[in-house]
Amino acid sequence: ATVNGPMGQATLATRPARMLSEATVVTTFPEVGSKTEERAFQTVARQARLTRYGLDCYGYALLTVGQIDLVIEAGLSSYDVQAPIAVVQAAGGIVTNWQGGPAYDGGRIIAAANAGVHAEASRFGCAVTLPVSTQT
């Protein structure tokens, strides 16, 4: 995938594989949905090198240009994730729900630069069995 801008054309590509302990993870809000979802996110965030908040869809853009490693969200609607999923996947990333299934319906999302950091984040907290979140 490529993007055209004022500096010309650039290739979109996620970061190469790295350990979660070297990763940058982002989410929109520190509380990431319910208290249970927040605890699951914090389990992953404590393992990461750097955590940032408040990026909304900009986090997905940073993922597609190789600036961060993970976007972890909860409480999303399908319209929140359709476009970011397409761009992240075109850049070589992986996007699933927290259980590793399709993410197109929204809900709890892990968008990762590569399968390795995705698997590690899932193992450290986001794959925990959680009740279905309520969408408002």
Pin down the residues of each PLM region.
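Short, charged N-terminal helix-start/capping segments
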Residues: 6-7, 31
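Short, mixed charged/polar active-site loops
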Residues: 9-11
